[in-house]
């Protein structure tokens, strides 16, 4: 609902609704994804000799086979490299690939950041894999232990949080990074070097334009403790939560609009000069607004006819008759301006009409 509702009902994790939620109601939030990197191992790792390629892979291949269950050490979205020699740690080609799918011992890849294409250079049998969190370039290195926790004999408190427009409904481009928060802390009393609160639920709550924190990762059993003497539970894989369940509300009734606009009734406490009727546009709604303006005597209502009266009506005489008929149903007043046209315009920022 709002920040106060969040503080009262969710801010300590009592809501049991997952780890993050969209900041406001509506289907728009279904486009969001929140990803976290809670440890150095989640940020970057080199696989062991038991997790190497099981067989060579040719130029152009988009799938590789590995020795053991890849889901235990790779994650969809990881950016990976292959060693140049068998069992080596010579990751010298500079070629990077992103994991798009994992099925046991088969890993599907695309070139990164290109987003398509397979291997540029053949990979040798038993090549080792170095993986890195997909959003490593959005933050300041691997999370570790903050200076605040170090001075209090704590460790492993840092965490990165990134908010993604997964489906593109917010920014227009799927996968856009909307916000990134580097080296926040799991310690409830944490402060940044500048003295600001650095506890990650509080930072997200206070600064994010898109999401609220709702709860800790269930594996982070002591996250939220004070820093002193706490070795924060290591979660060695990145996490991601694609938000869902958001629904747009139904159209407001005239009664609901009346209750909302009546907040403007008191001229002594609310300053308003222009009252816009908005897209509802019913005669009853406009009449309610005129009542407010006439009682205040210091503002004017602006109202338009019904969209169906003028839009897609090809005959101008019919349009005129429709507009006159609509406004004939509304009482005369000196506190309202009635217009008659709808403007078809281009939004160059969103590339829509």
Locate each region found by the language model.
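Generic beta-strand structural signal
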Residues: 57-59, 101-104
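A generic structural motif
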Residues: 62-66, 104-116
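A glycine- and small-residue-enriched flexible loop/hinge signal that marks low-structured segments
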Residues: 1-48, 75-100, 110-353
């Amino acid at each position: 609902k709002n920040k106060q509702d969040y503080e009262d009902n969710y801010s300590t994790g009592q809501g049991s609704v997952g780890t993050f939620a969209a900041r406001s109601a509506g289907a728009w939030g279904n486009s969001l994804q929140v990803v976290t990197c809670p440890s150095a191992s989640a940020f970057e790792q080199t696989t062991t000799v038991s997790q190497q390629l099981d067989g060579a892979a040719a130029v152009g291949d988009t799938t590789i086979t590995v020795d053991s269950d890849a889901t235990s050490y790779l994650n969809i979205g990881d950016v990976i490299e292959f060693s140049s020699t068998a069992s080596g740690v010579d990751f010298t080609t500079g070629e990077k690939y992103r994991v798009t799918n994992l099925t046991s011992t088969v890993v599907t890849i695309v070139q990164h950041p290109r987003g398509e294409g397979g291997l540029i250079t053949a990979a040798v049998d038993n090549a080792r894999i170095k993986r890195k969190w997909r959003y490593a370039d959005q933050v300041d290195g691997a999370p570790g232990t903050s200076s605040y926790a170090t001075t209090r004999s704590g460790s492993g408190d840092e965490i990165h949080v990134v908010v993604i427009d997964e489906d593109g409904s917010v920014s227009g481009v799927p996968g856009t990074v909307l916000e990134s928060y580097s080296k926040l802390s799991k310690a409830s009393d944490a402060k940044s070097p500048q003295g600001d609160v650095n506890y990650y639920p509080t930072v997200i709550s206070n600064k994010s334009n898109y999401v609220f924190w709702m709860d800790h990762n269930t594996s982070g059993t002591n996250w939220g403790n004070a820093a002193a003497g706490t070795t924060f539970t290591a979660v060695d894989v990145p996490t991601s939560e694609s938000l869902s369940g958001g629904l747009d509300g139904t159209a407001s009734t005239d009664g609901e609009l009346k209750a909302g606009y009546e907040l403007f009734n008191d001229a002594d406490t609310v300053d308003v000069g222009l009252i816009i009727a908005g897209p509802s546009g019913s005669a009853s709604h406009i009449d309610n607004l005129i009542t407010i303006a006439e009682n205040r005597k210091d503002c004017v209502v602006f109202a338009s006819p019904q969209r169906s009266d003028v839009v897609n009506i090809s005959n101008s005489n019919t349009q005129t008759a429709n507009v006159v008929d609509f406004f004939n149903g509304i009482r005369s007043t000196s506190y309202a301006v009635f217009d008659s046209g709808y403007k078809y315009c281009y939004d160059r920022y969103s590339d829509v009409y």
